[in-house]
Amino acid sequence: GLLGLGYGGYGYGAALAAPAAVSYAAPAIAAAPAVSYAAPA
């Protein structure tokens, strides 16, 4: 993230950003099938 860029360059920023992106995406990925199953009902 931006803090990572400030505290050690692109590598550190990417190391912080990747887990954050996964943690944010995981609930959406998990919810998508539930929404698609619920939609017809």
From Swiss-Prot:
Keywords carried by this UniProt record: Cuticle, Repeat
Q: Where are the sequence repeats?
A: 17-20, 25-28, 31-34, 38-41
**Could you tell me one molecular function GO term of this UniProt entry?**
structural constituent of cuticle
Source organism, top-level taxon: Eukaryota
Q: What does this protein do?
A: Component of the cuticle of migratory locust which contains more than 100 different structural proteins.
**Record text about domains:** The tetrapeptide (A-A-P-[AV]) repeats found throughout the protein are also present in many proteins constituting the protective envelope of other species.
Name under which the protein is recorded = Cuticle protein 32
Q: Write down the species.
A: Locusta migratoria
